[in-house]
């Protein structure tokens, strides 16, 4: 990062951990500078003005200085917008933050990804049904990382067609496959309809099946990048299992 001092940069807080007696180490995702590590001195003290500002899921405007990897937070202000998520929506917010924290490189500018993060966080905090917003964000993230396959043309050079069936594999071009169910059962990767690929590409899901197939695609690609899994998803699965067992 070339600037020694950065002022009034919009960020989202991804995670924080205690630092020494009363400070916090914060991982934040900024619009112009990507993911940055910030040292918030005395932020854990009861009288600190930062206590109500350094929170996840809502945008903040922060200023920092320093040329080392760990910058010193100079100022932080809440930018307003929306309330913290509640209930199951909290896990959606944690899931998004964990994706960004684990998959982005430090100080790699991704302004479009920041805008996508702001959009999905607003949906998570405000909309009861934000599943489509999560799928759109996952696809934006995969594109920003350069690992999303081309959904305009298949591996033969032909256009992706709504009435065809395709096989999607990590690090490979999308390929058309036979609709025969016996043959499809032996295909590796994600077997999806062309319309679902078009919907994912355009970010507009026409049916529940299309949305479900989008989940299949993003889970396959993200799972390749994070074979160890995601803590937020594991916790949510445990809660769902508990709900099923106690229903």
From Swiss-Prot:
Cysteines joined through disulfide linkages: none
Presence of keyword Transcription regulation: no
Residue runs in coiled coils: none
Listed GO CC annotations: bacterial nucleoid
Top-rank taxon: Bacteria
Keywords: DNA damage, DNA recombination, DNA repair
Family matches, as Gene3D superfamilies: Nucleic acid-binding proteins, Recombination protein O, C-terminal domain
Function: Involved in DNA repair and RecF pathway recombination. Involved in pilin antigenic variation.
NCBIfam families, A to Z: reco
Homology family: Belongs to the RecO family.
Protein known as: DNA repair protein RecO
Lineage: Bacteria, Pseudomonadati, Pseudomonadota, Betaproteobacteria, Neisseriales
Gene assigned in the entry: recO
């Amino acid at each position: 990062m070339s600037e020694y001092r950065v002022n009034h940069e919009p960020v989202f807080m991804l995670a924080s951990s205690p630092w020494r007696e009363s400070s916090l180490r914060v991982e934040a995702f900024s619009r112009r500078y990507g993911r940055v590590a910030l040292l918030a001195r005395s932020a854990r003290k009861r009288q600190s003005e930062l206590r109500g500002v350094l929170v996840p899921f809502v945008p903040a405007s922060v200023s920092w200085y320093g040329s080392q990897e760990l910058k010193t937070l100079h100022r932080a202000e809440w930018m307003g917008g929306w309330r913290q998520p509640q209930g199951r929506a909290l896990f959606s917010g944690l899931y998004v933050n964990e994706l960004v924290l684990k998959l982005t490189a430090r100080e790699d500018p991704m302004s479009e990804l920041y805008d996508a993060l702001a959009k999905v966080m607003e949906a998570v905090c405000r909309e009861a049904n934000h599943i489509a917003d999560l799928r759109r964000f996952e696809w934006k993230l995969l594109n920003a990382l350069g690992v999303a396959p081309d959904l305009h043309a298949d591996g033969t050079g032909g256009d992706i067609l709504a009435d065809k069936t395709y096989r999607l594999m990590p690090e490979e071009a999308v390929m058309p496959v036979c609709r025969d169910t016996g043959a499809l059962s032996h295909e590796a990767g994600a077997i999806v309809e062309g319309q679902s690929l078009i919907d994912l590409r355009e970010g507009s899901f026409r049916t529940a099946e299309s949305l479900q197939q989008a989940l299949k695609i993003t889970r396959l690609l993200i799972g390749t990048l994070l074979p160890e899994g995601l803590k937020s998803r594991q916790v949510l699965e445990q809660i769902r299992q508990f709900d099923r067992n106690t229903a």
